[in-house]
UniProtKB/Swiss-Prot annotation:
Protein known as: Protein TusB
HAMAP family tied to this protein: Thiourid_synth_B
Keywords, comma-separated and alphabetical: Cytoplasm, tRNA processing
Gene from which the chain derives: tusB
Organism listed in the record: Escherichia coli O81 (strain ED1a)
Job description of the protein: Part of a sulfur-relay system required for 2-thiolation of 5-methylaminomethyl-2-thiouridine (mnm(5)s(2)U) at tRNA wobble positions.
Amino acid sequence: MLHTLHRSPWLTDFAALLRLLSEGDELLLLQDGVTAAVDGNRYLESLRNAPIKVYALNEDLIARGLTGRISNDIISIDYTDFVRLTVKHSSQMAW
């Protein structure tokens, strides 16, 4: 399943998101959700421990001035890769 987080993790039921993640799921951080990728924040450690791949939309990182501040554990992708993820996953959950 593809999970997309478009809101700030501080304004989301992040605990529920983590509970619903399953091994093999993928999470795309976009819009204000990319703030979860910033090194040193409390949400990043939870994502590192989850059995998933985590991506962040590069355009949203640039728009928020975060490109140099994200963790190396987060995979930065463009819109083409975003489309590939949506095609890959028949089911999706937006947060």
